[in-house]
Amino acid sequence: MNMRISSKILLFISAITLLSQSCKKDEAPQEVSYGVNPVTSLPPNAGKSKLKTDQQYVAILHANLFQVALSANQIFEISQCIESIGDKELAREVIISNFMNKSGVIMPSEAEMRADIRKFIIDTYERFLVRKPTEAEITFFTNYIKANPNVTPELVYFSFSLSNEYLYY
């Protein structure tokens, strides 16, 4: 009988020892770190929330294309033209076409564009959208320009001038 009791006591002590060792809660949970820096992910144009007025659009467009400011009278006349046409996007297309058909537009030649496409893309983004392009944008435009031999700097400038992002500052 003594043997039976001692084996039960031994079993009981073993069970308590195992349970006390296996059921310990961590004192403080450790934060898992994978060596990645925390980064706020926002779109490149997140800071642009104010819509340009017609006068601002015309003045900035002319300055981007010619690197010279328009007179107040010219800005007023062109903005009146925009307001008189019901479709503002159509009016912008006409204004950009008229500006592009004038002499004095400062843009690289097609040979210069194709010689250094990356530089052309970065310069165009900084000139029109006032920001650096993302690597995805650079890759997209590089592939697009290489794949389409009919793309000219004039078409790229035209498309940037018509982009939705260009309407905001």
Per-region residue spans from a language model:
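Hydrophobic helical h-region of N-terminal Sec-dependent signal peptides
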Residues: 12-16
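C-terminal motif of bacterial Sec signal peptides marking the signal peptidase cleavage site
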Residues: 19-22
